[in-house]
């Protein structure tokens, strides 16, 4: 049975889809059959896959996510970003016979929250079009006191968005992982570095995990899973429902490219003045948590200033 020796365990909306693709393209690495297995999610979590999870099938089922490439790979990995906030992966992975390396990619917290909101509202079309980011922040900070009906406001994204501000207090969530795996096996990287210089970012990670860094000298770094604004939100919601019924294939991929080109650049991508004010408010709230993160892990977070 093959199990991962590296897990990208967080955080959501921090460039991990691109990271997964770039690492999986390396000849000495083997990525899971799907980027996010969600296999080790806690019981009762809405992202837990029914019938395909640790609680139902144990480690044997987990091994099925890693294909034939695992036999020759130096790095076998998956990338479920919500593991950062779960107890099950912390317990299971820390008791494997061979302790895996853990990778976290973190983004300026206020910007991560903003990206998550926009992705849910635009790409996923789950959030009501009339819910502004500023109002979302206000409801999030009310911590349930405002009586918000999150399911009505955000549909399938309700659970994640309701917790997104708390999810961005990284120091609270990373501390248990460092305690279990040790600082030397927990690699904390920055989204800002990934975006500004992906080549240096990947070469640095390759050196850390013991694969040939020179592979990335001539690599093209294709982007993956980027957030975009949509011109026609109601149409996008209908198209997403239809997409689930259409089988995968070359024609579907070609149509998708044309559709996204037509939709891209909508108003959802613009940053409104009230959004900017809400972001400033979030930044003030996050500062003490960022300082704690920098102090405890020895990180340079000047890119977040």
What is each model feature region?
Residues 1-84, 95-105, 109-156:
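PAPS-dependent sulfotransferase catalytic core
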Residues 62-65, 89, 170-174, 201, ...:
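Alpha-helical packing segments of well-folded alpha/beta enzyme cores
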Residues 48-50, 131-158, 233-265:
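Charged, glycine/proline-rich intrinsically disordered loops and linkers
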Residues 85-90, 198:
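Short, well-ordered alpha-helical microsegments
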Residues 56-70, 126-218:
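PAPS-dependent sulfotransferase catalytic domain
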Residues 175-280, 284, 299-305:
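The conserved 3'-phosphoadenosine-5'-phosphosulfate
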